[in-house]
C-alpha cells in the first residue's frame, strides 16, 4: 500500500485573491468592465459572481464584456465594494454606512449587509457595573497579502470592517467609569487603569492619565471587534448604548432577490450563515476564557442571544438614504424618513398592535431596495425564526400530505406584514404573499430535515437514550435537530445525575436498550415526501438544554414508544413560553 503525501499551504485562498486583486489594479487578465456613471471598473467575472448574487444572475447566459449599473450607484462606493470582493475588507467613514449598505443590498452582497447592520444596530455588553474596551490581538490573525495593515495607516484611516474574516481572539482591558483627581507632579492617581499584565496588553491611556493630559473621566462605552476605535474615529460620540433587540436568526438566511433563478436561495446561503454563527459562538467562548482580569466559571453557561458580543460603533440617528428614497418614494413607514434612534419601536401598521424596531425595519428596506417580494421575506424572517417557520404551515393552506398538526403563522403579525407590503407595492397580490410564506416554511423544514442524520451521527453514544429517560417531558419531546454547542457539558451533567440517581433507573437504562426512531415517518414535524439532501450547512439555531431533575425528585418512568403527544407545541401561546420564540405578544 503506497504512502499518501499531503501538502497544505496556509492562507492559499487569500494569497490567490491577493494576486487577482493586484492583476485587477494593473488591468491584467480582466474579462469584464462595470460602468458606473461613465467610469469603467475592470474586474474578473468569477470573483464578482462568487461575491454577488446580482452579478451572478447578470452574467448568467450573457457574454458581454461591459455592463452598466444604474445611476443611483455612486462610483466611489462601488469602488470600495469591488475592493471588498477581492480582499474581504471594507473601509468607510461613519457617514457612508447607509450608502454602502444600500449599494451592497442592491448588488446582493450578503456579508456587507449583515455585518454592516451589526455595526449600526446591535449592542452587546450585558454588564451594568463596568464596561470594557477591547483591543485586537495583532498576532492572532494570519497575515496575508490581502489583510496586512500598516500601523501608521491604521491610526489615520477610518474603522475597517472584515465580514469574511473570523473574529480574532480578543483581549480584555477593564475601564472603570469614575472621577479621577488630577495627579500632581510627583503623585500617582488614586486608582490607575488596570492594564491586565497577564494578557500582555499595554494601554496608552494609562500613561496619558498619569501625565495629566487625558480627560479625567473615563467613558463608559465598549467597542467589540474594532481595534482602538476611540482613536481611529477622533470625533466619536462616547456615550452608552442601551440594550436593544436582536434581529431574528432567520433574517440572515433569506435571499435579496426575487428572480426565478434564485427563488430558493435560502439553502444556498446556509453555509455562509452557519459558518458566521459557528465563528461567533466559538470565539465568544474563547474570549471569555482569555479574560485574565475576571473570574470565569469552569464551565460557562451558553450565552443568550441578546447578550452576545458584537460591534458597537456609536448611537447615530438613522434615516433612509436619499438615494433609496429617490427610487422607492414615500411608500415606507413615515417615521423612516426622519432621523431617529435605531432601537425605537415603531408600529408596523397603524392600529395593528405589531411593533418592530426602527433598525430592523430599515434593515429590511436596505436589503430589499425596490423589490417588494424581498421586503416580504425580510419582514417575515424578522418576526419568525427558522424553527417557527419549520413548525408551521405558512398561511393555513395545507396539502393532503402535510402534517395536520402544523398550525398557521400568527395571523395578527402575518396580516400586518401583508398590509405593509401592499402599501409598499399596491400590485402585490395576497395569493403571491401566501405562496412566498409557504415557500419559506418548506425551505426551513427541508434544511432541518437535511441535517437531522448528520446531527444524530455527531451525538455522543447514548445521548438518545438519556434524552428519552431523563426529564419529565422526555416521552413527548423528540431529539431536537438543533443540538446545542454545549452538548458535551450537558451530557456529562446527565451522567453525573445518573450516578447519583436510583439504582433501579441505572438498571433500566443499561438493560432496556431503547432506540429513538428519527426517520420522517416517526417525526411528524417533517414531510414524508421530502428527500434528504447530501450537502448543506450547519444548523444555526440552538435549542436550550433540558433542565436536570432536582435531587429530591423521583426518577422518571422509562420511555414507552406508544405514549406521548405532539412533538412540538403548536399554538402561539405555547410558542411564547419557548426561549427560542421570536414573537410573543407585542414586539
From Swiss-Prot:
Example of a GO biological process term: negative regulation of transcription by RNA polymerase II
Please give the superkingdom of this protein's source. Eukaryota
Which cellular component terms (GO) are annotated to the entry?
chromatin; mitochondrion; nucleolus; nucleus
- Region (Disordered) residue ranges read 240-272, 542-587
The biased composition feature labelled Low complexity covers 567-576
Q: Which residues form the BTB domain?
A: 30-94
User: Where does this one sit in the cell?
Assistant: Nucleus
A Pfam family of the record is BTB
Question: Start and end of every BEN domain?
Answer: 351-448
Record keywords: Isopeptide bond, Nucleus, Repressor, Transcription, Transcription regulation, Ubl conjugation
**Main role?**
Functions as a transcriptional repressor through its association with the NuRD complex. Recruits the NuRD complex to the promoter of MDM2, leading to the repression of MDM2 transcription and subsequent stability of p53/TP53.
User: How does the annotation summarize its subunit structure?
Assistant: Homooligomer; mediated by the BTB domain. Interacts with the NuRD complex. Interacts (via C-terminal part) with HDAC2. Interacts (via BTB domain) with MTA1, MTA2 and MTA3.
Give the protein's recorded name: Nucleus accumbens-associated protein 2
Q: Lineage of this protein's species? A: Eukaryota, Metazoa, Chordata, Craniata, Vertebrata
Amino acid at each position: 500500500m503506497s504512502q499518501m503525501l499531503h501538502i497544505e499551504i496556509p492562507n492559499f485562498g487569500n494569497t490567490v485573491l491577493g494576486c487577482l486583486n493586484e492583476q485587477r489594479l494593473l488591468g491584467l487578465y480582466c474579462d469584464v468592465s462595470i460602468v458606473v456613471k461613465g467610469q469603467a471598473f475592470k474586474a474578473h467575472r468569477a470573483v464578482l459572481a462568487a461575491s454577488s448574487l446580482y452579478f451572478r444572475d447578470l452574467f448568467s447566459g450573457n457574454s458581454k464584456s461591459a455592463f452598466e449599473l444604474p445611476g443611483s450607484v455612486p462610483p466611489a462606493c462601488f469602488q470600495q465594494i469591488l475592493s471588498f470582493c477581492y480582499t474581504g475588507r471594507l473601509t468607510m467613514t461613519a457617514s457612508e454606512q447607509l450608502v454602502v449598505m444600500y449599494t451592497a443590498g442592491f448588488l446582493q452582497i450578503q456579508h456587507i449587509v449583515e455585518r454592516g447592520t451589526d455595526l449600526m444596530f446591535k449592542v452587546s455588553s450585558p454588564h451594568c457595573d463596568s464596561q470594557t474596551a477591547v483591543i485586537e490581538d495583532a498576532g492572532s490573525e494570519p497575515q496575508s497579502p490581502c489583510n496586512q495593515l500598516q500601523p501608521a495607516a491604521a491610526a489615520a484611516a477610518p474603522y475597517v470592517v472584515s465580514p469574511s474574516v473570523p473574529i480574532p481572539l480578543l483581549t480584555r482591558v477593564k475601564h472603570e467609569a469614575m472621577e479621577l483627581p488630577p495627579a500632581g507632579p510627583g503623585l500617582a492617581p488614586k486608582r490607575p487603569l488596570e492594564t491586565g499584565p497577564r494578557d500582555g496588553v499595554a494601554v496608552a491611556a494609562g500613561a496619558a492619565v498619569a501625565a495629566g493630559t487625558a480627560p479625567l473621566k473615563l467613558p463608559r462605552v465598549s467597542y467589540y471587534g474594532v481595534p482602538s476605535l476611540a482613536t481611529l474615529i477622533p470625533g466619536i460620540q462616547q456615550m452608552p448604548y442601551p440594550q436593544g433587540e436582536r434581529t431574528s436568526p432567520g433574517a440572515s438566511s433569506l435571499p435579496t432577490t426575487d428572480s426565478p433563478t434564485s427563488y430558493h436561495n435560502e439553502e444556498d446561503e446556509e453555509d455562509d450563515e452557519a459558518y458566521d454563527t459557528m465563528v461567533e459562538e466559538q470565539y465568544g467562548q474563547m474570549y471569555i476564557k482569555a479574560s485574565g482580569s475576571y473570574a470565569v466559571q469552569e464551565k460557562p453557561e451558553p450565552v443568550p442571544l441578546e447578550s452576545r458580543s458584537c460591534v458597537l460603533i456609536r448611537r447615530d440617528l438613522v434615516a433612509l438614504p436619499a438615494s433609496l428614497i429617490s427610487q422607492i418614494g414615500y411608500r415606507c413607514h413615515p417615521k423612516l424618513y426622519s432621523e431617529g434612534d435605531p432601537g425605537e419601536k415603531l408600529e408596523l401598521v397603524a392600529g395593528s398592535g405589531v411593533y418592530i424596531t426602527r433598525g430592523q425595519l430599515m434593515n429590511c428596506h436596505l436589503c430589499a431596495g425596490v423589490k417588494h417580494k424581498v421586503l416580504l421575506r425580510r419582514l417575515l424572517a424578522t418576526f419568525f425564526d427558522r424553527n417557527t417557520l419549520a413548525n408551521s404551515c405558512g398561511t393555513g393552506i395545507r396539502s393532503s400530505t402535510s402534517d395536520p398538526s402544523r398550525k398557521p403563522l400568527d395571523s395578527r403579525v402575518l396580516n400586518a406584514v401583508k398590509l405593509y407590503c401592499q402599501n409598499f407595492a399596491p400590485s402585490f397580490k395576497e395569493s403571491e404573499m401566501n405562496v412566498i410564506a409557504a415557500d419559506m416554511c418548506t425551505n426551513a423544514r427541508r434544511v432541518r430535515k437535511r441535517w437531522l442524520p448528520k446531527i444524530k451521527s455527531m451525538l455522543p453514544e447514548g445521548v438518545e437514550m438519556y434524552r428519552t429517560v431523563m426529564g419529565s417531558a422526555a416521552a413527548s419531546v423528540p431529539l431536537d435537530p438543533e443540538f446545542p454547542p454545549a452538548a458535551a457539558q450537558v451530557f456529562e451533567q446527565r451522567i453525573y445525575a445518573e450516578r447519583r440517581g436510583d439504582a433501579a433507573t441505572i438498571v433500566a437504562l443499561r438493560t432496556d436498550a431503547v432506540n429513538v426512531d428519527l426517520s420522517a415517518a416517526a417525526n411528524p414535524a417533517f414531510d414524508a415526501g421530502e428527500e434528504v439532501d447530501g450537502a448543506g450547512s450547519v444548523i444555526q439555531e440552538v435549542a436550550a438544554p433540558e433542565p436536570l431533575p432536582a435531587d429530591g425528585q423521583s426518577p422518571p418512568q422509562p420511555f414507552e414508544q406508544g405514549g406521548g403527544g405532539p412533538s412540538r407545541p403548536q399554538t402561539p401561546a405555547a410558542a411564547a413560553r419557548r426561549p427560542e420564540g421570536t414573537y410573543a405578544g407585542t414586539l
